[in-house]
Amino acid sequence: MEGFVLRKGQRLKTFAPARYRGEGVAGEGIIKDLSLSGSYIIGNVPVSVGMMLALEIFVPGDPELLLIDRATVTWVKRSKFGVEFDILQPKVGERITQVISMLAKTQPRSSRNG
């Protein structure tokens, strides 16, 4: 179906403040879920599909920012949007994995199966 984007990898539900910026755009928002390949964000400044953004994610309980140099906006619905990360540097991928692991340990486990 047109309008649907398949997710690559499991996403971790989270609530992390973030800043994003791109050509002519600078905003703040909340990361609602995070995976190695992308994220779902609620932002205060509109973006467009195809736009390239840089992200600064403030990880709860971690003094070090998670910096994503290149993320492509894949969908937009009002103030909500999805981005896919362009992970070219292994250190960025390692840092995202580290953050996801840390956040997963702090979240309560679901009693649901599957």
Q: Locations of the language-model features?
A:
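Short coil/turn motifs at beta-sheet boundaries
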Residues: 11, 48-50, 64, 76
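Short, charged beta-turn/beta-strand-edge "cap" motif at the junction between a beta-strand
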Residues: 58-63
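N-terminal helix initiation/capping motif
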Residues: 1-34, 101-114
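Short structured motifs
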Residues: 2, 38-41, 68-69
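Short beta-strand-centered aromatic/proline hotspots
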Residues: 29-31, 67-74
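Short strand-loop-strand
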Residues: 14-46, 52-54, 80-82
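A residue-level detector for short acidic-glycine micro-motifs
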Residues: 33, 73-77, 87
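C-terminal output/interaction extensions
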Residues: 80-114
